[in-house]
């Protein structure tokens, strides 16, 4: 399923003809350039590799420079891949724009969530706090028991505990496209999308629409 790579600009609002305010996230979609086409014969699966934006020449290593030169496209800030469905064909060097979503109503948006650093179980996992009084003087935000005793004699993997919060890949599904601005290469998506301002986001047609 083909999507687009964009950059989160920030949030604003637009008004309907009835005067209703709709909160939207603005995603800037610079031209997505196809840097490689993968086929069943050569790679075992069908996909396109795309790059977006630009990168300083002194930040492009020789391997990347050769790869982009072979495709005849400008070096971008990263490489992403989209699987192709039967019948879909793209040429190396082709450009994908926001017009790809002219007929699309709902999208899934993937980004890297804001990093929150080391956080306790209350903030990280929404644990309830313990009593503020009634004899409790030290363990107000402590997580409590983390397991059993000699059986099994260990803490199970995946146990919700304090640790690094955020800075992970997150997908928000079924967001509505409010407007496609082809002139300024902008997508206006209803509601919030993952990540901080300036972060990369992947916008794809919704799988559950």
Curated annotation (Swiss-Prot):
Role summary: One of the primary rRNA binding proteins, it binds directly near the 3'-end of the 23S rRNA, where it nucleates assembly of the 50S subunit.
Family: Belongs to the universal ribosomal protein uL3 family.
Record's subunit section: Part of the 50S ribosomal subunit. Forms a cluster with proteins L14 and L19.
PROSITE patterns hit by this protein: RIBOSOMAL_L3
Keyword Ribosomal protein in record: yes
HAMAP family, per database record: Ribosomal_uL3_B
GO cellular component terms, semicolon-separated: cytosolic large ribosomal subunit
Matching NCBIfam families: L3_bact
Keywords noted in UniProt: Methylation, Ribonucleoprotein, Ribosomal protein, RNA-binding, rRNA-binding
GO terms under biological process: translation
Positions of modified residues (N5-methylglutamine): 150
Source organism of the structure: Vibrio campbellii (strain ATCC BAA-1116)
Source organism superkingdom: Bacteria
Name under which the protein is recorded: Large ribosomal subunit protein uL3
Gene that encodes it: rplC
Entry comment on modification after translation: Methylated by PrmB.
GO molecular-function term, one example from the UniProt record: structural constituent of ribosome
């Amino acid at each position: 399923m083909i999507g687009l790579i964009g950059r989160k600009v920030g949030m604003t609002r637009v008004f309907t003809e009835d005067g209703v305010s709709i909160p939207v996230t603005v995603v800037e979609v610079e031209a997505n350039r196809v840097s490689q086409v993968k086929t069943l014969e050569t790679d075992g699966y069908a996909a396109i590799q795309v790059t977006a934006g630009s990168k300083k020449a002194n930040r492009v290593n020789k391997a990347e420079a050769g790869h982009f030169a072979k495709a005849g496209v400008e070096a971008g800030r990263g490489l992403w891949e989209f699987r192709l469905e039967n019948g879909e064909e793209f040429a190396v060097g082709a450009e994908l724009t926001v017009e790809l979503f002219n007929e699309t109503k709902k999208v899934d948006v993937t980004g890297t969530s804001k990093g929150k650093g080391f956080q306790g179980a209350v903030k990280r996992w929404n644990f309830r706090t313990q009593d503020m009084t009634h004899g409790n003087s030290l363990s107000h935000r402590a997580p409590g028991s983390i397991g059993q005793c000699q059986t099994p004699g260990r803490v199970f993997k995946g146990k919700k505990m304090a640790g690094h919060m955020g800075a992970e890949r997150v997908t928000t599904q079924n967001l509505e496209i409010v407007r496609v601005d082809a002139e300024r290469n902008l997508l206006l998506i209803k509601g919030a999308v993952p990540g901080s301002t300036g972060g990369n986001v992947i916008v794809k047609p919704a799988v559950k629409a």
